[in-house]
Amino acid sequence: MRKIRTYQEVSHTTESELLEQVIEQQERLADRLSQVKRLIAIASGKGGVGKSAITANLAVGLAKKGFKIGATDADLNGPSLGRMLNVSGAKLRDSADGVEPAMSPDGVSVMSMELLQNEADAPLKWREPSLGGFIWQSSLETGVLREFLGDVVWGDLDALLIDVPPGTDKIKRLLELLPSLDLMLLVTTPSETTRFVVAKSIRLAQEAMIENIGLVENMESHVCPSCGHASRLFGTGQALEEDAEEPLPQWGRIPFDPRLGASTDQGRSLISTEPDSVTAVALEDLVERVSKYIKGG
């Protein structure tokens, strides 16, 4: 029986042991993911754009359509997807084939670092050599993500959603780990600062030869609850589509709604709590676009 190591056990792994495990883990990873029809990364490069909330709503929306969906939080230091999908406090179960993921009330298989920690609010601490600590930590983080994907019994999935943490370096490591990624959705907002950072993520994905890259513009506008008028939150900047070497498709434009954050904080999706809201309808449009992609359309 194989168990995913706790973060204390990961921290005690020596460099030589880590290197010896990589080939074995890669083989397990390839075997495990062969049962997954579509590998979909939701990334940005910039924090604070609502990426995890969109991932959670996308996962729930696809599951409600009857798809077998898995979701993993690749943010080891600040995981939030487990809470948003209402599996906080769930106990992981070992099986002969590996570790069973937590199952959300909406039928989404979930794996997150918070499920491996004894205390939900405990910060993740890495034991590292006195020299080269940053490089060591990066290797450990990549190794843990490899285990999340390779040692968890995902089973036959229509899609596995990977919530990528902020930072273009995190995107780069994911692309190195999963060169066969099927789709990368890059979440942005209309702000000029976010556009600048996400443009770098676009370039990384294009250089990695990811065939399918889509943009999701979150907080695209604010809809007045009284009159229904939509107004821009950030003004108008150059479209990200124009930054790309080749035109990028816009997969979704999501209006700002404070209830989106409030619902995910409670472990519920906006498409379930406020299905008729403008933002929920926009999220459903994104779900429909991704569902067609999963089917091969």
Task: Kindly label every feature range from the protein language model.
Residues Q117-L175:
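Phosphate-binding/switch loop-helix module in NTP-utilizing enzymes
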Residues V36, G47, D73, L81, ...:
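Residue-level signature of catalytic and energy-coupling elements of molecular machines
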